Amino acid sequence: MGIGNENKGFITASADALINWVRTGSLWPVTTGLACCAVEMMHAGAARYDLDRFGIVFRPSPRQSDVLIVAGTLCNKMAPALRQVYDQMPDPKWVISMGSCANGGGYYHYSYSVVRGCDRIVPVDIYVPGCPPTAEALVYGIIQLQNKIIRKDTIARK
């Protein structure tokens, strides 16, 4: 017993893998509910799906957030405000487009006042389809974002 010549176990990981693993466990989305998809976003944050267990805490300020969930119809008048919210977020930042209206204009695609997809205003990482998408679909989209973050090179040379 005591200190011997036993093999000691080591955990090895790259700095990229460690940083990305930490980032996946603390995604903080800013609450931007533009239409009916916001109800499903609130449903995903409530007790049944409980996004807190994934480390996801909704923040009221873009300066405290690293994920922007665009939930609903984006109109031309709201587009500059959405871009301003995106620009205020610290790096690294990710965008989830939630619902048919945010993805491509949805039901209101041919309206003069609707932006035909929020990807014309901000770069989108994950698209969640549906009208409105269910809370399960949003949770799946968040899991896909976590998988995307894990695969990203953070400090490695490109």
From Swiss-Prot:
UniProt KW keywords: 4Fe-4S, Cell inner membrane, Cell membrane, Iron, Iron-sulfur, Membrane, Metal-binding, NAD, Quinone, Translocase, Transport, Ubiquinone
Provide the top EC class.
translocase
Which EC numbers characterise this protein's activity in its record?
7.1.1.-
| Compartment(s) where it occurs, according to its Swiss-Prot or TrEMBL record | Cell inner membrane
Pfam (any one): Oxidored_q6
Coiled coil segments of this chain: none
Q: So what does this thing catalyse?
A: a quinone + NADH + 5 H(+)(in) = a quinol + NAD(+) + 4 H(+)(out)
> How does the cofactor bind to this protein, according to its record?
Binds 1 [4Fe-4S] cluster.
Query: Which cofactor does the UniProt annotation name?
Result: [4Fe-4S] cluster
Q: Name one GO molecular function term.
A: NADH:ubiquinone reductase (non-electrogenic) activity
Please give the GO cellular component terms listed in this UniProt entry: plasma membrane; respiratory chain complex I
Q: Among its keywords, does the record have Amino-acid biosynthesis? A: no
Residue sites binding [4Fe-4S] cluster per the record? 36-37, 101, 131
Indicate how the chain sits in the lipid bilayer: Peripheral membrane protein
GO BP annotations of the record are:
aerobic respiration; electron transport coupled proton transport
PANTHER family, A to Z: NADH DEHYDROGENASE, NADH DEHYDROGENASE [UBIQUINONE] IRON-SULFUR PROTEIN 7, MITOCHONDRIAL
Relate the protein's function as given in its record: NDH-1 shuttles electrons from NADH, via FMN and iron-sulfur (Fe-S) centers, to quinones in the respiratory chain. The immediate electron acceptor for the enzyme in this species is believed to be ubiquinone. Couples the redox reaction to proton translocation (for every two electrons transferred, four hydrogen ions are translocated across the cytoplasmic membrane), and thus conserves the redox energy in a proton gradient.
Question: Matching HAMAP family, A to Z?
Answer: NDH1_NuoB (MF_01356)
Listed under subunit, the entry gives: NDH-1 is composed of 14 different subunits. Subunits NuoB, C, D, E, F, and G constitute the peripheral sector of the complex.
The family annotation for this protein states: Belongs to the complex I 20 kDa subunit family.
Q: What is this protein called?
A: NADH-quinone oxidoreductase subunit B
